[in-house]
Amino acid sequence: MGIERWRRRRPPTRWSLVIRRGIAAGLSAVLFGAAVSGCSSGDDAVAQGGTFEFISPGGQVDIFYDPPQSRGRPGPIRGPDLMDPNRTLSLDDFAEQVVVINVWGQWCGPCRTEMPELQRVYDATRNEGVAFLGIDVRDNNRQAAVDFIVDRKVTFPSIYDPPMRTMIALGARYPTTVIPSTIVLDRSHRVAAVFL
């Protein structure tokens, strides 16, 4: 399954197919690696002796929703822009685009590792109808989160959501307690895949 599946059908060039497949494989590898070392707590977290271990729902770290008609939509995702508190970001800002939502926190080690990789994928796909939207959670120090983004030269927008209110929009159908996690929405903003 690749980005080309979510795009409008037009004859792809050989080069664009190579790029898209490489991006999809790279994004999957980055997200899988981050998922293995996720910064989570909650019902899926287990303490094993003196160590902490994450157990993903059903033992899965990559969840795909196919066929497209079986995909659900998240509720309204909106909140203040991390970089500009006077601006509100919304999923509606990305109409008819594939949207990669990344839930992160500057305090999360795997988030620090994956953010530069996500930026590279964003740079490679933003002109192909793919938008990225970050959701910064559990960061009560806004300036620390801003510094995190500036230091890593991240250019895609993020919602600032310390209490995780935005995650309520995902409801009980999708995992929301794993940080970092990435949710890929198709052009109709249906959940196509979740990477924990």
Annotated model-derived regions:
Residues 1-80:
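N-terminal targeting signals for export/organelle localization
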Residues 89-112, 118, 132:
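Short active-site neighborhood of thiol/selenol oxidoreductases, capturing the structured segment around
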Residues 147-155, 161-196:
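Thiol/disulfide oxidoreductase modules built on the thioredoxin-like
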Residues 112-152, 162-169:
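Structural microenvironment flanking redox-active thiols in thiol-disulfide oxidoreductases
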Residues 81-83, 185-186:
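Short, acidic, Ser/Thr-enriched surface-loop or helix-capping motifs
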Residues 3, 85-87, 190:
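Residue-level signal for well-ordered, solvent-exposed loop/turn and beta-edge residues enriched
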Residues 75, 99, 179-180:
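Short loop/turn microsegments at loop-to-beta-strand junctions
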